[in-house]
Structure formats: structure tokens, C-alpha cells
């Protein structure tokens, strides 16, 4: 099937998907842990309550829930997770809310918004930096993750 729009090519489209998937994976790491940590969490901090929520909303709920967590290591994890999700949501949203343009003869996305004022191309280098940042944040979240020995599934 021939697309009815200009395409940046499979490699660039793969990078878009890679970033979206990496963010979703980090999000699920945190959401997937809520059940096993439930004895230490406020009753409203559940997968069911957060199903369908934006990544930004999940980030806020995790940080708010940290203040009510009864175990310090769980609170630390929720803060680390909430902070990480807030940051990766911005990266993913930069791509998903960008617009196509032609840069140096190639189709690329261009992020342009007025509040806060910013404009930049979503280049291969931008993807490299964004994916490296998501990976670093995922490692930080995993380092703060309460053990399965202490909190079995």
C-alpha cells in the first residue's frame, strides 16, 4: 500500500516506535508493581485507578502516593518512578505532538510550541539522546525498586 503522505522512511519510523515503547515499558514496570506493593500504598494507587491515565497523570499520582506510603523504600521508589515518568512523558510527547517537515531534503518531525517556547527538529541525534535518557532513568527506577523478596508478587 502506498502511503498518501510523505514518509520519513522505516528507520526513522522505527525510532519513533522505539521511544514510545521504551516509555510504555517504564510505565508498566511501575504500574505492574502496584499490586505487590499494595499493603504499603494508599487505596487509590492501583492499576485499576490508573488504567487509561496519561503518563503525566501517573507520574503525579505516584509522587502524591509516596507521601502516604507506609514503607520508606516504597516511597523512595514511587518518587523515583514519578520523577522518571514525568521526564520521559515530555520526551515522548515531544515526538507525538511534533509536526512533519522537510529538513535537508528528508522528512522529519519538528517540535514547535509556544508555552513553553521551544522549537527543534526531532533528529537522529535527538533520538539517540532521548533513548539514552530513558534508559538511564529506567536504570535509576530499577535501582530504587523494592525487592521481590521483601514484596513478593
Describe the role of every protein-language-model region:
Residues 89-129:
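A mid-sequence interfacial segment
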Residues 52-80, 113-132:
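Short, glycine/alanine-rich amphipathic alpha-helical segment
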Amino acid at each position: 500500500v502506498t502511503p498518501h503522505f510523505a514518509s520519513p522512511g522505516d528507520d526513522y519510523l522505527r525510532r519513533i516506535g522505539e521511544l514510545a515503547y521504551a516509555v510504555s515499558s517504564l510505565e508498566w514496570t511501575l504500574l505492574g508493581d502496584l499490586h505487590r506493593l499494595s499493603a504499603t500504598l494508599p487505596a487509590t494507587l492501583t492499576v485499576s485507578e490508573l488504567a487509561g491515565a496519561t503518563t503525566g497523570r501517573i507520574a503525579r499520582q505516584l509522587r502524591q502516593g509516596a507521601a502516604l506510603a507506609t514503607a520508606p523504600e516504597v516511597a523512595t521508589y514511587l518518587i523515583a518512578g514519578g520523577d522518571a515518568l514525568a521526564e520521559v512523558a515530555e520526551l515522548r510527547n515531544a515526538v507525538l505532538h511534533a509536526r512533519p517537515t522537510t529538513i535537508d531534503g528528508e522528512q522529519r518531525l519538528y517540535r514547535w510550541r509556544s508555552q513553553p517556547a521551544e522549537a527543534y527538529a526531532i533528529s537522529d541525534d535527538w533520538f539517540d539522546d532521548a533513548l539514552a535518557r530513558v534508559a538511564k532513568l529506567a536504570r535509576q527506577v530499577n535501582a530504587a525498586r523494592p525487592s521481590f523478596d521483601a514484596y513478593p508478587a
